[in-house]
Amino acid sequence: MSLKNCYNFDDFRKLAKKKLPAPIFHYIDGGADDEVTMNRNTDSFNDCDLIPNILNSVGEPDLKTEVFGTKMDMPIFLSPTAMQSLYHPDGDKASARAAEKFGTIYSMSTMASFSIEEISNLSSGPKIFQLYIHKDQSITNDLIDRCKRANFNGMCITVDTIVAGNRERDHRTGFTTPPKFTLDSLMSFAMRPQWVFNYFTNKKFELANLKDKVEKGTNIAQSVMGYINEQYDPAMNWEDAEYCIKKWNGPIALKGVMSVEDAKRAIDIGCTAIMISNHGGRQLDGSRSPFDQVKAIKDAVGDKLEVILDGGVRRGTHVLKACLLYTSDAADERSSVDLGGRRII
């Protein structure tokens, strides 16, 4: 199987499984606990039927929309994905180029493989930054200040990851960042020689936005769950979010809102948008799917907030269903990068 033979998301997933070592593939592919929520995110779209009205003159469809104060050519954008250079050497650079090519937003993770400044210099397309609030407030402040200097268009504060989800696939494979080549994992890496070649002949893996502040994750191997539990602030509260909103002073969303009550409170602290998200089912297994929660939240907040659905999106009809339930936009974080990302978009 090659890129030219990939026609849907499942095709790309099969190709990724073929090309990536098991620890890398299962990190990006897996979810929390029994992965019920992860699978439900997509199943909820499939449980919703479309009833088309015919003869409505759609010869010149207009897919344009606006979110984070940014005009986009389509109602989808790339949700933030960590450590993309583990999946392709160009990592975040390829994602940013693909988003710019198709007139949509690129979202950068705090745990990106390339820095805020590198991506800003590479792409003139719209960009938002996904912020994790760290225990060390100087890290959080530094990230916000750098995004301001780099002229990012918006920011989203991830609020559903103050402690790590129980990702059992990662326990089994021993996934760490950077990857550790142990006796247990050696065979898996050895069976993917092209990945190994790319890993050792391209830019050294690093958490580019954090490397000057935190050694673990770049120079010292650590599990992602260990990093989250050690570095992210479990005491984060509404006051902390409001502080970041005021410091950023621009278009901003809370990412990880699932309840009507929290959506209403996001308005009160100055958010311009919310991302209805359960972190792709990677945090709390058993939570509701974003698609099933969209209408209740949108009915509650009206036009006071942009409402963005994150997670489970696999096809254009999924985007259509989300838009019909009043979202401003749809995002997904499991897309590939480079040519694969362009074909998926």
Predicted regions and their residues:
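Acidic (Asp/Glu)-rich catalytic clusters
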Residues: E117-S124, I267
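Glycine-rich active-site/cofactor-binding loop and its immediate structural neighborhood
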Residues: D73-S109
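Glycine-rich beta-to-alpha transition loops that act as phosphate-gripper elements at the mouths
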Residues: T110-A112, H134, L254-V260, E306-V319
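Conserved small/polar residues in nucleotide/adenosyl-binding loops
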Residues: Y326-A331
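Alpha/beta enzyme core
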Residues: D145-M155, I162-R288, Q293-V307, L324-L325
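Hydrophobic faces of well-ordered beta-strands that scaffold small-molecule active sites
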Residues: I76-S79, Y106-M108, K127-L131, M155, ...
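An N-cap/entry alpha-helix motif that binds or orients negatively charged groups
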Residues: S2-M72, P178-M236
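Conserved, mostly hydrophobic/aromatic
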Residues: P21, L78, A99, I157, ...
